[in-house]
Swiss-Prot record:
Tagged with keyword Iron: no
Organism superkingdom: Bacteria
Organism this protein belongs to: Thermotoga maritima (strain ATCC 43589 / DSM 3109 / JCM 10099 / NBRC 100826 / MSB8)
The encoding gene: iolG
Keywords assigned by UniProt, alphabetized: NAD, Oxidoreductase
The protein, known as: Myo-inositol 2-dehydrogenase
Organism placement in taxonomy: Bacteria, Thermotogati, Thermotogota, Thermotogae, Thermotogales
Length: 334
C-alpha cells in the first residue's frame, strides 16, 4: 500500500519514519509547505515524490492512503479532499476545533466509503492496552473510579498555545479519549477547574496550565483527570481503574528498570522525559493498525466519531471552567 504524508513537523516525521519500518506499506510521497524541509526529508527518507502543494499529493493516482499531520486548521479541508479523491485517511488529533467541520469530515468519508482514522496513539500503548483488556474482561469487577494522571515535562511554546484551542482541546483531549476507551462507555457530565500555576504568560494567552476534570459516566462510574503543563521530574503518564473486585494500575515508564538501594533508600532512573520517547512504540502500532484496517476493509480502530466525542468532552470542560458548573454533554452536542 502506497502512502503519502502531509505535514513534516514532529509527528509527521515520526509517522514517515515509522512507515519505512512497516512491510505492508510504502512511503511513496510527502508534502510540506516549507520547501527546505521538503527537500531535506525527501533525501533523508528516499521517497519517490515530494509535493509542496498537499492537493497534488492527494490527487496522485499512485497514492492509496494519506496521513494528515499538518496544522489543525488545515485538517478538515485536506480530509475532505482525500474523501473526494477516494483515499483512505489517517488524521492527527484533533480532527478540527470546529464541530461542524468534524461532522462534515465524517460525512464525506462515509459517503466516499473510505476510512477516517483518528490519531489517538495512546490506545496502542502496550501497558494501557493490557489495562483495557483487564477492565473489559471483568478482572476488577464493575469499574467504579478511573483516575488518569497526564502531566507534561514542559509547556509548549506560547505561539502554539494561542492557536491550540487550549489545554482541554490540545492536551486533555488524549485523556478524554482514553477515558472512553478504558471504561467502554460514554460520559454524560463533566466538571472542570483550572489555574495558572506554571507560567503566567499562559494565562495571558487565555489558557490555564493546571487542570482537574471530573467525569460522570452513564453507568454512574466516575473519572478524574489531572493535568499539568510542567512536571519537573519528567513525562508523567499513569492510569488506575478501581472496581468492585480490585484495582489495576499502569505506572510510568522509566529509562531503565535498574534500582539502586543504599542507606538513602531506593533510587531508580528517571521517567522518560519527552512524549516521542514515551510513546514511540505506540505510534508504530497505531500505523500498523491503520494499514491493517484499510487492507482488511474493517472499521477503523479509532473512528471519526471517536475523534468527535473527545472534542465534545473538551468543549464541555471548557464550558464548565468558564461557567464554574458541571456541564452535561448534551449541552455541547446540539
Amino acid at each position: 500500500m502506497r502512502i503519502g504524508v502531509i505535514g513534516l513537523g514532529r509527528i509527521g516525521t515520526i509517522h514517515a519514519e515509522n512507515l519505512k519500518m512497516i512491510d505492508d506499506a510504502i512511503l511513496y510521497a510527502i508534502s510540506d509547505v516549507r520547501e527546505d524541509r521538503l527537500r531535506e526529508m525527501k533525501e533523508k527518507l528516499g521517497v519517490e515524490k515530494a509535493y509542496k502543494d498537499p492537493h497534488e499529493l492527494i490527487e496522485d493516482p499512485n497514492v492509496d492512503a494519506v496521513l494528515v499531520c499538518s496544522s489543525t486548521n488545515t485538517h478538515s479541508e485536506l480530509v475532505i479532499a482525500c474523501a473526494k479523491a477516494k483515499k483512505h485517511v489517517f488524521c492527527e488529533k484533533p480532527l478540527s476545533l470546529n464541530l461542524a467541520d468534524v461532522d462534515r469530515m465524517i460525512e464525506e468519508t462515509k459517503k466516499a466509503d473510505v476510512i477516517l482514522f483518528t490519531g489517538f496513539n495512546r490506545r496502542f500503548d502496550r501497558n494501557f492496552k493490557k489495562l483495557k483488556e483487564a477492565v473489559e474482561n471483568g478482572t476488577i469487577g464493575k469499574p467504579h473510579v478511573l483516575r488518569i494522571t497526564s502531566r507534561d515535562p514542559a509547556p509548549p511554546p506560547l505561539d502554539y498555545i494561542r492557536v491550540s484551542g487550549g489545554i482541554f482541546l490540545d492536551m486533555t483531549i488524549h485523556d478524554f479519549d482514553m477515558a472512553r476507551y478504558i471504561m467502554g462507555e460514554e460520559v454524560e457530565e463533566v466538571f472542570a477547574d483550572g489555574s495558572v500555576l506554571v507560567d503566567e504568560e499562559i494565562g495571558k494567552a487565555g489558557d490555564v496550565d493546571t487542570a482537574v476534570v471530573v467525569l460522570r459516566f452513564k453507568s454512574g462510574a466516575l473519572g478524574v483527570i489531572d493535568n499539568s503543563r510542567r512536571a519537573v521530574y519528567g513525562y508523567d503518564q499513569r492510569i488506575e481503574v478501581f472496581g468492585s473486585k480490585g484495582r489495576i494500575f499502569a505506572d510510568n515508564v522509566r529509562e531503565t528498570t535498574v534500582v539502586l538501594t543504599d542507606e538513602q533508600g531506593d533510587r531508580g532512573s528517571r521517567y522518560l522525559y519527552f512524549f516521542l520517547e514515551r510513546y514511540r512504540d505506540s505510534y508504530l502500532e497505531e500505523l500498523k493498525t491503520f494499514i491493517k484496517n484499510v487492507k482488511s476493509g474493517e472499521p477503523p480502530a479509532v473512528s471519526g466519531e471517536d475523534g468527535k466525542m473527545a472534542l465534545l468532552l473538551g468543549y464541555a470542560a471548557k464550558k464548565s471552567l468558564e461557567e464554574k458548573r458541571s456541564v452535561k454533554l448534551e449541552e455541547v452536542i446540539g
